[in-house]
From Swiss-Prot:
PROSITE patterns: GATB (PS01234). Keywords: ATP-binding, Ligase, Nucleotide-binding, Protein biosynthesis. Signal peptide: none annotated. This is Aspartyl/glutamyl-tRNA(Asn/Gln) amidotransferase subunit B. Its EC number is 6.3.5.-. GO terms for biological process: glutaminyl-tRNAGln biosynthesis via transamidation; translation. The gene is gatB. It is an enzyme of class 6 (ligase). Belongs to the GatB/GatE family. GatB subfamily. Pfam families: GatB_N, GatB_Yqey. SMART domains: GatB_Yqey. GO terms for molecular function: asparaginyl-tRNA synthase (glutamine-hydrolyzing) activity; ATP binding; glutaminyl-tRNA synthase (glutamine-hydrolyzing) activity. Transmembrane segments: none annotated. Gene3D superfamilies: 1.10.10.410.
Length: 473
């Protein structure tokens, strides 16, 4: 029998806010345990939630980016279940009428373009974290993560292969980073995916019983987990068994999924409106104000890049949002290709030598443009621009002052350069004779000698021109 794979996804993205969804605690990753947990996050009595306005804004941005409906009235609900890292005994989430509804995202597969329907995206708070092994024989609880704002993005069961799932997740990952609503760090849990997978005989309309796969933190592992679970379910059904509705964990080391617990249905959580939170009212004026501030859609940006850059260059920029934003600021002044070369060849290579990560704050785009302007005005050479960048990275100061300090100002005095070139030709009569006899490659020898004699300060364009004039006399 031929079996068809049917998959729906639930992706949790941590929104990039400075404070939590309902408390003022910070959301910085990697801090000492329980140092970023307010009374509300710990579930202490007498505390009340206050909605983080920035989380609302970021949810609306996402909804607009996927052409979804933004709910004018949405509600927060209590999702009730018991787990040690859920201090209140319930999670504040959204059930009916979530903030984002009915969106779509187009993906590219080996069979062509496919539209994936997004059923909903709702706001909810993250849970804390159980810590094993910190205290011998005990499990600790760290509530730093509790209350961190999440946007859970739920698709319809539109996927029919692992390839489609990975293509969607990569596109979504790129989108949320591009929008600036999530840093997309999968290792730190900022972008997490649950896979709901079932199988059915080819051509059957009715869905099979699904299993939910958790604990998948890379695109490669998602592909492997899906293929394993598909094969497992086929084996179960073909041997006469029944697939159980359950949650399964993926073990990357063993490349297998293992049963974790029975999978709950919505009614098991006993959702009811949170009495401490008013309905969330979003006006048309608010939505319009956000539309005006939104960046180009990633598809629009990609189309512009592909007009001017090679495939590899486009992929590099699209996978590095901060660099792409920086690039856009430089490209609008000096052009697409020159901007790419300056950023990758001059700036990033200099940062690498200084053992520094790229950040738009280290050498702001305005500073790089000032350095480029000095090259264009023949004040410094292209080669010496890297020295200026390196000095700025080490000790930021005015670019003019750095050029003076390093003595990099080019000599553009024609008389001085001509005298220098004439002296070099006179000192190398054999090479000059060979040049006149047809060995034109010796031109670079004389240019190199002139640049060396001037300690790199002579204007290279003028040196080239004057060497040619003097040798052809």
């Amino acid at each position: 029998m031929n079996w068809e794979m049917v998959i729906g996804l639930e992706v949790h993205i941590q929104l990039s806010t400075k404070s939590k969804l309902f408390s003022t605690s910070a959301t910085k990753y990697g801090q000492h345990q329980n140092t970023q947990a307010a009374f509300l996050d710990l579930g202490l009595p007498g505390t009340l939630p206050v909605v983080n306005k920035e989380a609302i804004r970021k949810a609306v941005i996402f909804g607009l980016a996927v052409d979804a409906k933004i709910s004018k009235d949405s509600f927060f609900a209590r999702k009730n279940y018991f787990y040690p890292d859920l201090s209140k005994g319930y999670q504040i989430s959204q059930s009916t009428n979530p903030i984002v509804q009915e969106g779509r995202l187009e993906i590219e597969t080996s069979k062509g373009l496919k539209t994936i329907r997004i059923e909903r995206a709702h706001l909810e708070e993250d849970a804390g974290k159980s810590v094993h092994g910190y205290i011998a024989g005990e499990t600790g609880l760290d509530y730093n993560r509790a209350g961190t704002p999440l946007l859970e993005i739920v698709t319809y069961p539109d996927f029919r292969s692992a390839e489609e799932v990975v293509a969607y997740l990569k596109k979504l990952h790129q989108l949320v980073k591009h929008l600036g609503i999530c840093d997309g760090n999968m290792q730190e849990g900022s972008f997490r995916c649950d896979v709901n997978l079932s199988i059915r005989p080819q051509g059957q309309a009715k869905f099979g019983t699904r299993a939910e796969l958790k604990n998948i933190n890379s695109f490669r592992f998602i592909d492997k987990a899906i293929e394993y679970e598909y094969a497992r379910q086929v084996s179960v059904l073909e041997s006469g068994g029944e697939v159980v509705q359950e949650t399964r964990l993926y073990d990357a080391d063993a490349n297998e999924t293992r049963s974790m617990r029975a999978k709950e249905d919505a009614f098991d959580y006993r959702y009811f409106p949170d009495p401490d939170l008013l309905p969330l009212v979003i006006t048309d004026e608010y939505i319009e104000s956000i539309k005006k501030q939104m960046p180009l859609k990633s598809e629009e940006r990609e189309a512009v890049y592909r007009e001017h850059l090679a495939e590899q260059e486009v992929e590099f920029l699209l996978s590095n949002l901060e660099i792409a934003d920086y690039y856009d600021k430089v490209a609008v002044v000096i052009g697409y290709k020159p901007a790419y070369n300056w950023i990758t060849v001059d700036l990033i290579s200099t940062l690498n030598r200084a053992e520094k990560e790229f950040s738009s704050d280290v050498v702001p785009a305005e500073i790089l443009l000032e350095i480029i302007a000095n090259v264009q005005k023949d004040i410094i050479s292209q080669a010496n621009a890297k020295k200026v960048i390196a000095e700025y990275i080490d000790a930021p100061s005015a670019i003019e002052a750095i050029i003076e300090k390093l003595g990099l100002k080019q000599v553009s005095d024609e008389g001085m350069i001509r005298e220098l070139v004439q002296g070099i030709i006179a000192a190398n009569p054999q090479q000059a004779a060979d040049f006149k006899a047809g060995k034109t490659k010796l031109m670079s020898f004389f240019v190199g000698q002139a640049m060396k004699a001037s300690k790199g300060k002579a204007n290279p364009k003028q040196v080239n021109q004057i060497v040619q004039e003097e040798l052809n006399k």
